[in-house]
Every structure is written in C-alpha cells, then in structure tokens.
C-alpha cells in the first residue's frame, strides 16, 4: 500500500511539473511575440528615418524627381522613338544621370498618356460626327413633314379640280340634250326600232296659202305600198305624217 501511494504521489508531482513547464513555455512564447513585433517596427522606423528624408530622396536615383531639363530631353526622345531599345535606353539614362529602369517606366507612362490622348481626340471626332448626324436627321424629319403637308394640299386640290370638271361635264351634256330636243331633229336607229312620238315633229308641207315651203318633185319621197312593209311600226310612222 505504501508503494502504491508513493507511485500516485510521483505521478501527481510529474503531472504538475509538466503542466507548469507547458504554462511557462506558452507564457514565454506569448510574451516574446509582441516584443519581436515591436523590435521590427522600431527597426523599420530606424531604416525609414535614420538617414533623414532628404538623404533618402537625394541618395536613391530611382526616387529622385525629374528636373525640367530631364523631362524636356525625355520628351524629345519620345517624339523620335515611342519605344526605346535597351542600348538606347541605357545611353539616355547615362546622359541624364538616371536609372535605366526609371527611364523605361517614364516611357511606359508616356506611351499610356499618348494613347489616352489619341483616344480622347478620336472620341471627340466621333462625338462631333454623331452630333452632326443627329442634326441632319432632324432637318430631314422636318423636311419630310413639310413635304407631307404639301402632298395633302395637292391631293385636296386634285379632288377639287376633279369634282369641278365632273360637274361641268354633266352640265354640258344636259345642254346638248336640250339643244337637240329644241331643234326638232329625230334620232332613230334601225327602221324596226321603236321611237317616241313626243321627240319628233312632222315636217311642214306646203299647203294652200299657208305660207309654208313648197316641195318640188325632187323633194318627194317614194313610198311603196302598204303591203311591202313587214314591220307595222314603219307603216304607222308613215301614216302618222300623212305619207301613206
């Protein structure tokens, strides 16, 4: 029993020791992490501000601002060549006292600005042409409306002239019919066709002392006998005027 109790005590002591060591290790790790971060931040501050802002900007040629003369020389080179070769780039950078990579970046940005400018000019031209096309379309639409109005007026005038011509023709035909009825003429078709006695007037033969016209021998009409006519209407016509 004593041995069993000693083993339990040893196990408890070992477990407590292991737990304490683990807790200590975790505490050390948790305490070292913020210290490492602080050291890194301090180191970064020292690197950024140890030499001063003027020394960093002035000492590093990549971060130096370009002077007016350098910009002018780069612009002249860009007008001659849009994209520089490696040898030309290195030579120009050595002449201007710049880094070849900085010259390459400047040319890349300058090409992008040049392309944007060309796109803006092209857009301006297209917009101007679009506005002109819209204005021309409006003029054409107004012209179409005016032509439609003129067409309506012309159609009304044509209808008016046609109605006037129709009424004039009808009145002229009525006058001709009245003139024929007043002259005493008789219009007849074939001898077998029927006719109205009201439209024809008998000719006046000269009687005794009537003052009428006297017919000569040449004016006499030879009328055959009654039995020679097959149509009774002709016979009636001749008998009506006393020719039989």
From Swiss-Prot:
Q: Which SUPFAM superfamilies match?
A: Homeodomain-like
Q: Where is this region: Disordered?
A: 25-64
Which superkingdom is the protein from?
A: Eukaryota
Q: Name one GO molecular function term.
A: sequence-specific DNA binding
- Kindly give the InterPro entries that the UniProt entry links to this protein: HD, HDZip_class_I_plant, Homeobox_CS, Homeodomain-like_sf, HTH_motif
**What are the UniProt keywords, alphabetically?**
Coiled coil, DNA-binding, Homeobox, Nucleus, Transcription, Transcription regulation
- Which GO biological process entries does UniProt record here? positive regulation of DNA-templated transcription
What is the reported tissue distribution?
Expressed in roots, stems, leaf blades and panicles.
Q: Where in the cell is it found?
A: Nucleus
Where is there biased composition of kind Basic residues? 35-44
User: Would you tell me the Gene Ontology cellular component terms?
Assistant: nucleus
Residue spans of biased composition, Gly residues class: 46-56
Q: Point out the DNA-binding stretch(es).
A: 59-118
- What does the protein in this record do? Probable transcription factor.
Give the protein's recorded name.
Homeobox-leucine zipper protein HOX14
